[in-house]
Amino acid sequence: QVNTCDPNGENCNVGGWSAKDDSRITIWKGYYDTLQIKSPGSYVILEHFADNSEEIELANYGRMLWGNLNNNYNEASMGFSPGWNFDYGVYTARGWGSPHLITYMESHDEERLMYKNLQFGNVSGAYNIKTLATALKRMELVGAFFFTIPGPKMVWQFGELGYEYSINYCPNGSISVNCRTDSKPIRWDYKSVTDRDNLYHAWAAMINLRHSPQFSALFNSANNITRDFSGAFKWMKVTQGAANIMVI
């Protein structure tokens, strides 16, 4: 970052902060090496968002890095096409040699998928994504792809139950960017709602599949990923040895 500023540390080019920086890479490698000496096998996870050439080098050195797919998955869950291709959530699509990409659909910085499903979801005849039951089914749909793409994942709190309060939800029920960091309702009662519980179990089944002895190698080692995420009809096949999964 300092390399984009003038000699006084001012007039910085914020847009240049993500450009590949070899000095930054060296610093991170030093941190990683020290951690592995002190705690062998420890995970190092970066909220980095640098140029892909830098992230490739860090990923191949053992780091895991966040990958923001909020817009892509939300476009898919709402049933709209402009940004619904989530191919960049596949580590091989970025040229990475290891599945160290931690993709996420939601985070502390991103809008809740269910909020936008219910507010802006597509409608076709009787099929209405703005209705709770259908919106939750759309979350099962995107979850099927999200959890079966190899690599670690991040799930934001209550996403597994279809939490629909906006990131900008205010205590009085209104929506404002001024309320972004305000406390949000804690809805443990969602587990007793059948459609929300169905989503919970659908996501749990996908996660359990990742730990199944028959399929675990698909998510933890070099594998062949063929897919087409560009159109309305999406599919993916992951193969490792004799094991394979197909998601449609």
Where are these regions (language model features)?
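Active-site-proximal helices and loops of the catalytic beta/alpha 8
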Residues: V2-E110, A126-Y127, A135-L136, A144-K153, ...
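Short, basic, glycine/proline-bearing loop/turn elements
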Residues: L113-L132
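Asparagine-centered strand-capping/turn motif at beta-strand->loop junctions
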Residues: M246-I248
